[in-house]
Amino acid sequence: MAVVPKRKTSKQRKALRRSHHALEALTLVECKNCKQSIVPHQACKYCGFYKDKKVIKVALNDQVK
């Protein structure tokens, strides 16, 4: 058999425990090469540059969705 809680968890204790569960807004910066919004410390998925160097090949997608 499972263990049963000794006392009821109060609303305040529940709220304090869940206070760290909120979602944070994503931090975005402008790419120095193509001026698109990107996540910092990652290669740009639009042009493939990171720290002024081409690090990944990016396929051109001319189709408009």
UniProtKB/Swiss-Prot annotation:
This is Large ribosomal subunit protein bL32. Coiled coil: none annotated. InterPro entries: Ribosomal_bL32 (IPR002677), Ribosomal_bL32_bact (IPR044957), Ribosomal_zn-bd (IPR011332). Belongs to the bacterial ribosomal protein bL32 family. GO terms for molecular function: structural constituent of ribosome. It comes from Metamycoplasma arthritidis (strain 158L3-1). NCBIfam families: rpmF_bact. GO terms for biological process: translation. Gene3D superfamilies: Single helix bin. The lineage of its organism: Bacteria, Bacillati, Mycoplasmatota, Mycoplasmoidales, Metamycoplasmataceae. GO terms for cellular component: large ribosomal subunit. Keywords: Ribonucleoprotein, Ribosomal protein. Pfam families: Ribosomal_L32p (PF01783).
